[in-house]
Amino acid sequence: GKQNQVTVAAMVFDAYKALEKLSKHPSIDKDKISITGWSLGGGVTLFSAWKPIIEALGQSVNFASHLAFYPPCFFDFEEMCFSDSPIHILIGELDDWTPAKPCDEFVKKLAKSNVNITIYENSHHGFDREGELEFNENGYSFKDCMFDVNTDGDILMNYLNIPMTNPFLQKIGFLFCVERGVTIGGNKNARNKSFKFAKDFMHKTLSQSKKIN
């Protein structure tokens, strides 16, 4: 796809612009708006909970909860400071596109009661699909990647520590660690469990939500 033609920062900005718009709608409770995303969208879901970026955007409204399906977690934040809103990651044990291990380590490192993870056994990227497993020879595998994120929100290239502030630099930065070729496909058990979890998570976090920083 064309996912490397836009930066994560730009997508998070868009997410908060959408939140601002929704929060002004007379039929919507601004304190009961959640964000969820899949794969790269899951990364946006996580980054939208990072306090430095929330503060930099000068946000007056926040997401009530964050539910990320198989997000990229291969980021080492200089400032591990995240929202107190409920944050949950759903990811497959065998994911070779956005690996589960960095997500598990992220949750353990953050060590906050509102941040949790569910890892589905024998499941790959796209476990909530109905299709069979298939190999995508063009997909980026980030299993050997770990990018530093400084306090300004810049994602830095491996080794060079150059901020990937535009799509071109981001594409160059990926070349230092990514490999081509990933597996994607559904797992019926994981799909059913994740759908039920998502429904329960949204019901719980939105029915009980209150303004959280």
Per-segment meaning from a language model:
Residues G1-A10, S48-I53, N136, G173-R180:
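Cap/lid segment of the alpha/beta-hydrolase catalytic domain
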Residues D14, P102, K193, F197:
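Charged catalytic carboxylate motif
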Residues L22, P26, L110, M202:
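Hydrophobic pocket-lining residues that define ligand/cofactor binding sites across diverse proteins
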Residues I33, I87, N114-I117:
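Hydrophobic anchor at the start of a short beta-strand
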Residues C103-K112:
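Conserved loop-alpha-helix segment in the C-terminal half of the alpha/beta-hydrolase fold
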